[in-house]
């Protein structure tokens, strides 16, 4: 009987009809190791989910700080175990809500934060010594972390008990997402300032979440996702070491963020290969010796780009498959997308279903009862080894460019992602890749009539009014001194975090801080790549 077609991985390798225990398989199994031990192929903890489930961390944020705070408290009441904050585009790009460049975007794709007042409202009645918070923020990460620190101090929480993560991965913004402000080398200074500050002041805070997720969503395949992410990670670790930080003093605080696609077996292999690659990088390139420095800890999010506006309830199934891949792959925390996200921000109902998807996997599927349940499977082990080999080869190519930063400046990673995205789209258009409800199994009068969340259009006006009131009541002379101190620090070489924390606590706004840093650092203009 003939086969249905040609079967390949997302990165173009042929998928065999079946696998056997040949020499390649036996070699792969010999390198496995035990869970919780280098090279961590089988997981970063000996008991994995038998000891503690992954953190269920739903990404949320919209409109005003008050509205987002209500959503966070609702999710926590429904069993969520950590917060994940989405910020609107003006906040990500360094503009206050009353800046003309923020017009039409305030509160639309995340929560609007311009000042410490907004941030205090965002975290109202949420005890920061009991809940960890992940903040998806990059160009303005140092400022938002400064606000978090200031609010924690106001709550009376010792910084040694404050836990969470700032994404703070600016390099991937230049190749995959675009929310950059300053040139790459000046941005790298801010990243390393945050790493150094956290190593000294915030021992439970992950100063960076090096993100393959956005690279994958931009069109990269599984191998490119790992290779470009690890190339960025090598650049960050190298920069921190050059600043005089011993690698074992901060490496255990590094975290990662990956995508989970619906290609379940390939994704499980990808996550397992990632742990093995990172252990090797830290041991061989940087001489790390603390096992905690060698262990890859990562958050996973199901892929937004796989969600369809057509037949949107199918997305519940897509997300469940992707979430299962993340769990089988040993993620430390997980966000499951809501089924309506191809149409709007998640409604309360869709957010609850997304959270329940994780809870069903955790409590009813049985996959959390055994560590690395797919370990030893012929296909899984050989795919793990194949992805590892191909990723290391791609890292060699990036090294030949001069590393991640030089590659970005030459456009190497950007071109590779664009080419991969084009190949994927051609497969969809030619139906070589089936997307249920999009290019196959369509229905007439698609069932897109679902209730979606709409952001209150008055949010922008209320945010502007709040800023007017802030500027009237604050101590203008103190604000002037704090901004002068920040500019002086930016012109020098000292860590900027103390000046930023002081500025936000003294009612200097996010937009004002970014304006001062733009004046010192300049603004990044991407090269014309023709």
Where does each model-flagged region fall?
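Electropositive phosphate-/nucleotide-binding environments in soluble metabolic enzymes
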Residues: 66-69, 113-116, 142, 185-192, ...
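Catalytic or ion-translocation cores adjacent to nucleophile or general acid/base/metal-coordination motifs
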Residues: 159, 190, 345, 527-530
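Generic, well-ordered alpha-helical scaffold segments in large soluble proteins
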Residues: 62, 71-78, 116-126, 147-151, ...
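Flexible glycine/proline-rich, aromatic-decorated loop/lid segments
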Residues: 246-250, 288-302, 310-337, 346-371, ...
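Catalytic alpha/beta active-site cores
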Residues: 1-261, 266, 285, 292-299, ...
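Phosphate/diphosphate-binding loops
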Residues: 114, 132, 137-140, 152-154, ...
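Short beta-alpha connecting loops at secondary-structure transitions
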Residues: 103-108, 172-182, 215-220, 258-263, ...
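Flexible, glycine-rich loop/tail regions that form catalytic "lids" or insertion modules at the edges
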Residues: 5-17, 21-24, 37-40, 89, ...
């Amino acid at each position: 009987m003939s086969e249905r077609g040609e079967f390949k991985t997302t990165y173009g390798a042929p998928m065999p009809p079946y696998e056997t225990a040949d020499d390649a398989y036996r070699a792969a199994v010999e390198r496995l190791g035990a869970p919780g031990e280098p090279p961590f192929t089988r997981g970063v903890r000996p008991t994995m989910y038998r000891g503690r489930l992954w953190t269920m961390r739903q990404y949320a944020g919209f409109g005003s700080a008050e509205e987002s705070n209500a959503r966070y408290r609702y999710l926590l009441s429904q069993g969520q175990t950590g917060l994940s904050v989405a910020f609107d585009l003006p906040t990500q790009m360094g503009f206050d809500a009353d800046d003309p460049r923020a017009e039409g975007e305030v509160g639309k794709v995340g929560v609007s934060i311009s000042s410490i007042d907004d941030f205090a409202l965002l975290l109202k009645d949420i005890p920061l010594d009991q809940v960890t918070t992940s903040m998806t923020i990059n160009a303005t990460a140092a400022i938002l972390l400064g606000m978090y620190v200031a609010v924690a101090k106001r709550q009376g929480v010792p910084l040694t008990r404050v836990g969470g993560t700032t994404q703070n991965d600016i390099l991937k913004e230049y190749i995959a997402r675009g929310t950059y402000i300053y040139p790459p080398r000046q941005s790298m200074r801010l990243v390393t300032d945050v790493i150094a500050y956290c190593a000294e002041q915030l021992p439970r805070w992950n100063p960076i979440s090096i993100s393959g997720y956005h690279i994958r969503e931009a069109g990269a395949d599984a191998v490119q996702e790992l290779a470009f992410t690890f190339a960025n990670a090598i650049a960050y670790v190298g920069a921190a070491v050059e600043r005089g930080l011993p690698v074992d003093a901060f490496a255990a605080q590094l975290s990662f963020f990956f995508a989970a696609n619906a290609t379940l077996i390939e994704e499980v292999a990808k996550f397992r290969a990632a742990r093995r690659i990172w252990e090797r990088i830290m041991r061989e390139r940087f001489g790390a010796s603390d096992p905690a420095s060698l262990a890859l800890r990562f958050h996973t999010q199901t892929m937004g780009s796989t969600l369809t506006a057509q037949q949107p309830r199918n997305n519940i199934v897509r997300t469940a498959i992707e979430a299962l891949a993340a769990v089988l792959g040993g993620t430390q925390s997980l966000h499951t997308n809501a089924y309506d996200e191809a149409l709007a921000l998640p409604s309360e109902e869709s957010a609850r279903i997304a959270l329940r998807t994780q809870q069903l996997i955790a409590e009813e599927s049985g996959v959390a009862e055994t560590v690395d349940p797919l370990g030893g499977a012929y296909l899984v082990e050989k795919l793990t080894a194949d992805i590892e080999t191909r990723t290391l080869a791609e890292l060699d190519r990036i090294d030949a460019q001069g590393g991640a930063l030089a590659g970005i400046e030459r456009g190497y990673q950007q071109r590779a992602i664009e080419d991969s995205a084009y190949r994927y789209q051609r497969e969809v258009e030619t139906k070589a890749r089936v997307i249920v409800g999009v290019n196959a199994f369509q229905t007439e009068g698609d069932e897109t009539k679902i209730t979606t969340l709409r952001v209150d259009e008055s949010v922008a006006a209320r945010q502007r009014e709040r800023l007017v009131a802030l500027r009237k009541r604050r101590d203008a002379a103190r604000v002037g001194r704090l901004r002068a101190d920040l500019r002086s620090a930016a012109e020098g070489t000292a860590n900027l975090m103390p000046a930023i924390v002081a500025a936000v606590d003294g009612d200097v706004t996010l937009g004002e801080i970014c304006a001062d840093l733009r004046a010192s650092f300049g603004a990044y203009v991407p090269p014309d790549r023709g």
